[in-house]
């Protein structure tokens, strides 16, 4: 098919057909952009290097650090439970410079948890601010701005996953 043939076929579409084509193309482009994402070789720890369960994502603005952490946390929640004694099998933490940064960036931001799993519910109680999944898994949000905030981190309890978010 030549470019001219394609132009003629597109010009012959009804408005409804053109809208359907646009919708399908948008979906394919979105899937190609996000679902086919693969890390660069330098973003994956080599097999022979022991990570001790820690990994650092270092990059500039817009390089996908928050997106990567949110995807990982959602995959972690949907994976096997870390502790069968805990509702939902997972107790996690999100730590940011302030609690507001954790909410705005890690939860509600364009690359945050809600963008990857709309089932996530943000709850604030006397015990703090939590992100909860329907399964019962939860992530507690912490700020690290003041000495009192840091003291709260010490009383946070054991967690199977900790996400340190920059602001």
Regions found by a protein language model. Name each.
Residues 2-167:
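Phosphate/NTP-binding elements of NTP-utilizing enzymes
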